[in-house]
Amino acid sequence: MNTIISPKEIALYIDHTLLKPEASPAAIRTLCAEAREYSFKTVCVNSCYVPLCVEELQACPVDVCSVVGFPLGAMLSSAKAYEAKLAVAAGADEIDMVINIGLLKAGELEAVRADIETVFAACGEADLKVIIETGLLSDAEKKSVCQICKEVGVAFVKTSTGFGHGGATVADVELMRAVVGERCKVKASGGVRNLADARALIAAGANRIGASAGIAIVNGEEVPPSR
């Protein structure tokens, strides 16, 4: 991939993200205004804010992405599916679900598959991205869950929530891309704070960047790590 992709082109890769528990309606409106101004691919928000984002982004090419089962993934699959169904009904174009990490760590791969399939079925025409939380997984576990995602046929595999240990790395994106090939896209999320990071992840195979630092990225600036 082109490692000298321009900042303007980078904007089309970015899910402009605000998932903090203290995020207010006013902050979500600002997020949407920024996404319109910079032509980001989507805004990524908690499901309660999907209707507001749909309202704010009317007649605008920016899509709405909702997280589901976020950030732990440790809820009933039926509850994740219901949240996804409601978000899609409210206008979400994309769903980012968190897998049941504990089941994957326990080697219960069929249960992990069932969890993903249940949410996938609830998404209808919306694209499903599956967050695997790479910072908590061995390489073997990353490969196993990416293979499941490939077989189920989800739209994306995604590195991280940004709430757990670690974030997106070039090595993880390369590993995920090697497993899914062209069958799924790859979203790199977690700790992407500058243009160089974004370019490196795209060069490694990422099709999408999840970041709260989208404006800094396209402006060639850097956001310091959160504390």
Swiss-Prot record:
PANTHER family to which the protein is assigned, alphabetical: DEOXYRIBOSE-PHOSPHATE ALDOLASE
- Gene encoding this chain? deoC
Q: What is this protein called?
A: Deoxyribose-phosphate aldolase
Keyword Lyase applies: yes
In which compartments does the protein localize? Cytoplasm
Active-site residues, record numbering mapped to chain = D96, K158, K187
Q: Taxonomic classification, please?
A: Bacteria, Pseudomonadati, Thermodesulfobacteriota, Desulfobulbia, Desulfobulbales
Family membership, please give it: Belongs to the DeoC/FbaB aldolase family. DeoC type 1 subfamily.
Q: SUPFAM superfamilies per the record?
A: Aldolase
Entry keywords, A to Z: Cytoplasm, Lyase, Schiff base
Name the enzyme's class: lyase
Under the heading Pfam families, the entry gives: DeoC
